[in-house]
Amino acid sequence: MTSSNTLQKAIDLVTKATEEDKNKNYEEALRLYEHGVEYFLHAVKYEAQGERAKESIRAKCLQYLDRAEKLKEYLKKDQKKKPVKDGESKSDDKKSDSDSDSDDPEKKKLQGKLEGAIVVEKPHVKWSDVAGLEAAKEALKEAVILPIKFPHLFTGKRIPWKGILLFGPPGTGKSYLAKAVATEANNSTFFSVSSSDLVSKWLGESEKLVKNLFDLARQHKPSIIFIDEIDSLCSSRSDNESESARRIKTEFLVQMQGVGNDMDGILVLGATNIPWVLDSAIRRRFEKRIYIALPEEHARLDMFKLHLGNTRHQLSEQDMKLLAAKSEGYSGADISIVVRDALMQPVRKVQSATHFKKISGPSPTDPNVIVNDLLTPCSPGDPGAIEMTWIDVPSDKLGEPPVTMSDMLRSLAVSKPTVNDDDMVKLRKFMEDFGQEG
């Protein structure tokens, strides 16, 4: 769409809005005014040539926004009276402001939208389920668990952390750690929000959502606000960013600073894979910045054991150690994928087998009963091999083939790590400059 087309579209929309306004179709007029302003702002940002043209469009935007706000106020008051006229005194507006905040339907609507971000059920992830990351766990216990359990410890100048940033390569357990915090902080309300929960297409609504998020957190103290991929909301300020993004960032800064509000009992927990794009003022609000690195060998060993669980396998402790050594550079998520792929290998053996043989083992229907007529895949040369496919095997007679070391090595060979060296260099540089190791 060219500049003239965008501007013309904006002019057409506000012209229609004015007509609907005159005809007292206020809801339609409000919709058209807001739509028109969006087109005007698009033209200012991307297409308007010259500062004078931009100033002219901005002045028009303010005029139409002012009228839209008055219409919104009128529609909010469910009374049969005329709307505030253009240029009329704002005394009526002041009267409406005197109404109780708790009765504000717009606030209720925004808070209702945010209620969906509250994790009502605990995720059931314990500290022991998170392999490694001891420094990160200790910092989170210090910030969340101890102040709730021993509030008398954190008085006077000794105050708990208000903001913690978890940064590191993708798949290292940042979100998983947040789930563990939600589980262990029994008395806390856990808000898990993403950028989509806070960004709205309506002008001015996004920053109201941010404000209402913190208001909700204050109402449900003690509370934890977890913002995943915080870089999508709070990247560095620049000339070419939208006005909406700038306002969201400003509201975040105001709320996290606690200007005019109390931040006691509220922890903001952020997670990002690309911390270097965060705005410096936002970075300062996160007092603790913890680097969640790729797992070390002992942590990778624990991860292989955790992901295998009680699945039938033939891996020895030595095999596990070898897998941990061979998986350097793999994140926790990468190891999870390797094990999941290896766990599918017995299923593939069943699918491709042309011969089965009888074995004894626990019954698939009752593991406490040992039966002697289970069928498991085998090679054609095995003693007792019966030529058949999985279709011929009764559902309660299949003997599950165990996961073997060769299955794990095959999966490790085909599943590559997802973290690249360039990102690791940037993350280590950020950690050296601003963070601490987790």
Curated annotation (Swiss-Prot):
Localisation per UniProt entry: Prevacuolar compartment membrane; Late endosome membrane; Midbody; Cytoplasm
Chain residues that bind ATP: 168-175
GO molecular function ontology, one term from the record: ATP-dependent protein disaggregase activity
Disulfide bonds: none
Biological function: Involved in late steps of the endosomal multivesicular bodies (MVB) pathway. Recognizes membrane-associated ESCRT-III assemblies and catalyzes their disassembly, possibly in combination with membrane.
Protein name stated in the entry: Vacuolar protein sorting-associated protein 4
Record key words, sorted: ATP-binding, Cell cycle, Cell division, Cytoplasm, Endosome, Hydrolase, Membrane, Nucleotide-binding, Protein transport, Transport
Catalytic activity: ATP + H2O = ADP + phosphate + H(+)
GO cellular component: cytoplasm; endosome membrane; late endosome membrane; midbody; vacuolar membrane
Name of the top EC class for this enzyme: hydrolase
Source domain of life: Eukaryota
Organism: Bombyx mori
Domain remarks: The MIT domain serves as an adapter for ESCRT-III proteins. It forms an asymmetric three-helix bundle that binds amphipathic MIM (MIT interacting motif) helices along the groove between MIT helices 2 and 3 present in a subset of ESCRT-III proteins thus establishing the canonical MIM-MIT interaction. In an extended conformation along the groove between helices 1 and 3, also binds to a type-2 MIT interacting motif (MIM2).
Phylogenetic lineage: Eukaryota, Metazoa, Ecdysozoa, Arthropoda, Hexapoda
Any one GO biological process: endosomal transport
Family to which this protein belongs: Belongs to the AAA ATPase family.
Notes on how activity is controlled: Activated by Mg(2+), but not by Ca(2+).
Protein EC: 3.6.4.6
Keyword Transcription regulation: no
PANTHER family: AAA DOMAIN-CONTAINING, VACUOLAR PROTEIN SORTING-ASSOCIATED PROTEIN 4A
PROSITE patterns per the UniProt record, alphabetical: AAA
Quaternary structure annotation from Swiss-Prot or TrEMBL: Oligomerizes.
Comp. bias (Basic and acidic residues): 84-98
Ranges for region Disordered: 76-113
Tissues expressed in: Expressed highly in head, silk gland and testis with lower levels in fat body and ganglion. Also expressed in ovary and hemolymph, and weakly in Malpighian tube and midgut.
